[in-house]
Swiss-Prot record:
It holds the Pfam family Sugar_tr. It comes from the Eukaryota. One of its GO terms (cellular component) is membrane. This is Putative transporter B0361.11. Belongs to the major facilitator superfamily. Sugar transporter (TC 2.A.1.1) family.
Amino acid sequence: MSISRRSYEQFDEMKSENQENNSKKKSSERLKKLDPDKFVEAYGAYGKYQIFTYVLVQTLNFFYSSSMYIMSFVQLNLEKQCEYKNETIPISETCQIETESSKAFGNLNGEYCGIAENTLVNVTNQKASTNLLVDFDLSCSHWFFQEFGLTIFTIGAVIAVPFMSMLADRYGRKPIIVTTAILAFLANMAASFSPNFAIFLILRAFIGACSDSYLSVASVATCEYLSEKARAWITVVYNVAWSLGMVWTLLVTLMTDDWRWRYFIVSLPGVYGFALWYFLPESPHWLITKNKTEKLKKYIKTANRVNNVSPEFNDCQQSSHHEEKHESFKALLGSKKLIWLLFANGFIEMVISLVYFAISFMSVELGGDQVQAFLYSSLIEIPAGLAVIPLMMKMGRKMIVIWCLVFQTLALIGVTVFLDSYEFKLVIMLVAKVMATIIYSVHPIWATEQFPTSVRSLCFSLMNIPQSMGIIMSPYVKHIVMSPNWIPFVVIALFSFISATLAFMLHETKNKKLPTDIESLSYPSETNDLSAYRRSKSSSSSVSALSKTSVRSKKTLSSESVSKKLDTVNFSDKEYRI
């Protein structure tokens, strides 16, 4: 008898284990068939956990911004004069003596001050002793080399970001974002102790590679963390964090006159990167498309707890599960449509980065009060970023980019009229920067929504190359001397107008699902309207409410009929009275 009972118990245990395994298998299969966009929307348009993760990654703009703009304050342009036997001789930017041979000191014409006998270069800037250029003996170097701290930063980004983005597509967004953020912080700390300019440039290249990597992958991840409706809010933290990074740089500049201390203090908040490892989750889009069901379960568990909801995901299912795809650069080159998207979006990014950063860097050297000009240039971005929210909700992505590019073109042409007036020139350039800020906020979201999930980070990094070219060119705009002096502004305005034309030829992405792979770009049905899903979701919820009401009414009716007939019970064909 005991043997029989034991065998029954073992049988029950095996049966329950099989049921549990089958349940887990079914659960995993359901997770593999999830639609990524509908999955995110299941937590609502503004789920707490989704907003939290968006804030985490977009805060990184603070550190990127400060890493860029600190260079404007550690190597301000030098005002120099040459002293020769208690006399002052005019010199060029590279310290070449410029005198007429027929006049006094004509024998020194063409010589270099500091090298010619009895000559001495004297820097007249009040705080020149704190300047990186003076510290590394670069006072008389060509302006191309003086700006190389910014240039090498971007060159490092161009080289590294495509490779890091491919790793992000293959191994996930989180490890790349966190690792590069921490490495950028450590390299920034080390750069403030650089013994010479060569070491400083090597570290700046590494910082640029890491900084652009975390920012590029974070931009992609943000669109994957949030629902389509909430993506308009990306610009809030993005612009506020970026502007605060600029203001932080300015505040530190006012704290100390020593360039090394300026650089060190500005870099300190970068310790934030270590916190990301603990708090930042992996992108749900990436987890679903890569069939990482166990990690997705952990994400769901945390999201359910933070959002205080437990979605069923019944309306988020697709007919088939995702095949794990590792689409390569070769697959990208095989798609003409994707190449067109890369070209058009890349050109737009190049132009807006050129305009945006050129104005930002020129505000420090524009004349007048450089602190005030840079402060205006920093703070103007906050209202510009906030304006994006209603604009994106009302107009989508495409029309905002087109109109802002047109107004940016007109502003750049307007600058040429007031080149000799500091106040008017500053105001019109700030108008152009407002337009550039709005485009810079909207266009990365728009471009990200056009690229497939399987190669989204790779595409974003390739688009980053022309963008980086715009950044590389931007600090040199202030050094261009042409006759007439309005030509550079007209040329940039022409590029801006061409960008508006290219934007007109691209498609709107508002209310559209993110394409999952390269093939889905060729099939519109694969990227159908999300608004249809929202309508079906709302209608199903109303139907559900109606069905619940009908069930309650049926229960009421049945209970009333039962109460009336409680004295009669039927068994088969016979009636018995209680």
